[in-house]
């Protein structure tokens, strides 16, 4: 084991590096590891067999080395895509710098266990809100381009393409073929989903597979795929086509279709149905317009038959006669009022004249005023004491005034 620190001046040789790695790996001890089998390489005359164990969610794998008799003695043969749990010890071969897992036991993951894990994951994702209808995106009415993820040359691909093009011949497809079962299915589907989701020309994505066994459909319940679908900006349709067992993808996708054919029908409208609908709407619109025109014509005819429009001058003449009568009555009332008021004024004038000083003077009476010598206004004489002899007097009669002087005064008895 090297004691010096690795530096540019004192680098470690490859053998020392490999020995260090080997020592560290050997300290890990025995491990239980779960994954999916792939690339099973078994020869009857070999003592050792070589397999690849892949992660169920990511593109990660590890090489397995195990005695051939372990595989030969199994009650059912192993095949690619089997979910298994292996027991082994990590081993690093320093001579060629390779890592593998030395396996001494291989156990299949039971269907019951797998279904229990799926249901547990289903509950977890539901609690996180991934199944919430509020987060599901609406599909476009008429997609210009449909993304399709499915197996190469599969019946699902043929069904979707043929049904969709029969319904709407102008629809375009961007098809990405992936594995739809086995260890590589999930990473390939996620990669295809990401590519289609990033394409601005793709309006909706269909993930399709034409059914299969529970084991075959396991990739469509893997957590990584569910989170990728939930994060996609483009609407995703699940078309797995397996009614008894519902993959989690059916819950997370924006729309679940029973089969690939059903997906094509629900994603792409039928041109014949749309043409029929357009004709029906056009006929309904024309009927509604004709009905409206008929009602308006009837209303106009009703208005035209009214007397005021049949003889428009008669109401005017009638109103003019009413105005003339009103003017005549008003003139008569005004004249009557004027005569009444004139008579009242004449009567009041006569009363004023009869009661005024002029009428009294006309009957021979007079008003005697003494004219003070200091120029002050004349004073009406009411007593002889106001007119001592020599006082200048002003005597007012009916038709004028007389100036006189007081000669003497005589007190009445």
Swiss-Prot record:
InterPro entries: Exonuc_VII_L, Exonuc_VII_lsu_C, OB-fold_nuc-bd_dom. One of its GO terms (biological process) is DNA catabolic process. Its EC number is 3.1.11.6. It is an enzyme of class 3 (hydrolase). It holds the Pfam family tRNA_anti_2. GO terms for cellular component: cytoplasm; exodeoxyribonuclease VII complex. The keyword Aminoacyl-tRNA synthetase does not apply. Belongs to the XseA family. HAMAP family: Exonuc_7_L. This is Exodeoxyribonuclease 7 large subunit.
